[in-house]
Amino acid sequence: VICQFFDILAEELNAKIVLASGNEGNLKMAVHKTFVADDTTLRSFIEGDEHSVEGDNKAYIRYGQMDFYGNDTKAFKIQAVICNTERNTIIKRFEVPMTEEANNGVWQYWCSSNFKQYDTDILDTSFDKYFSGYVGMSWTVDSVSMRRYATIDVYVIDNPETNANHKYRLGFEIVGEDGQRVDGYAATYTATFDNNGIAGWDDGTADGSVSDMATAMGTLCVGSYS
């Protein structure tokens, strides 16, 4: 993770690295939750923005990587999901199980037909119907803290014919244990977290959005937005 890189660099340079935070503004690029006995689920939608594609055409795109950190050595369940927002129903789930050690560091991608590049890519009919692009997942264990963290990598464009009203949205769902905490960070301008006003989904926040880069021993962090 990036905090380890900063520690190594600061030691080699015999210097302190100053991180200026604050450029996140009010973008909801972070999400945090401490689970309690009667609420062990964190779910949020991955949102993006309109971008130019193929000349003057515009498309609603979410892209980039999101990292989700546990606060201890325990595994947590994380899935990327497709939700029918009109019915508030998850219609598809994607997962690289964190409970199976053979999956440590393994990437798995699901994609639409026009984005399939590798033999290991899985062409998913539901994803292909409503989106163009891909969603990838992986997890590993931090070698210093021994905390587990997962990454979701997306490039997703809503299908202009079957999903023109953004009825079907991509999100994620995390299930943990009582007392466990998970912190997630998105790619700011290209991906944020939102509940879209739908019951049972968690909203993103700008709080804590400087990410784990500020936790390095050789850094000083100034100017946090919140």
Show where each model-derived region lies:
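Loop-rich non-cytosolic ectodomains and luminal regions
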Residues: V1-S226
